[in-house]
Amino acid sequence: MHNVTWGLDLSTNKRKTAAVALDWSTPGEARVVDVRFPLGATDIPALVSDHRESTWAVDVPFGWPDLFVKLMTDRHKGPLPAAAIPVMADWDKWRTREVAQRLTDRFLTDDTRIKTRPLPASFQLLGATAAMWALIEAQLVSHGVRIDRAGLEGAVCETYPAAALSAWRLGRKKQTWPELLESFTFLTADGSFLPHFAGDDVCDAVVCALVGRARDLGLTVKPLEEELAAARREGWIHVSCESRARLVGH
């Protein structure tokens, strides 16, 4: 296991994209050792490739819902056949849950430990970020970086800071740097990095890097065997419901 984990908070706007590296080599401590902010999308493949020995936890949908992909493919040929349309009483559920949500999104929404509904990659502006990730993913593969959308193999996994914080029983609200220091008492950073933490994008990247550590330690919730095929198409959001202290071995 490598001693450094990276978190990447991705946006279509480089001024809202941040990457943070945490060094875990000192017992009982997670030290911020690198911050890249702002960060352009075209700079990300080389950055990840250069640090491929580390785990990367990325805040972006790795894929689209299976049903959404099928719907777009089928409807591109013409109107949907009557047999493919749910009864009218189920239209809202079909639109907002079955089409909009991936398997991993429904899990986070329904699990009583987490109860966080991710924004849908199929709808809203998040689709543009997911499309950008599709380009980054292709470039990473061309650099020889292994990509498993389920996040079980290779160096890269998907996460969602709001769900990660909720799973750690910290609520879903974004945390400031002082709040992160209170929630994760083992976090530390040199003063030169502190100006970067004024915005929430870098702080979100810190949460992603914490999830990367949890994934390294086998502490994140993984898809079940029967869910694995879908997770490898749609992506799987990694969060940990274990004690935060376990990130530093307590």
Which residue ranges define each predicted feature?
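RNase H-like (RuvC/DEDD) metal-dependent nuclease/polynucleotide-processing core
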Residues: 1-6, 10-250
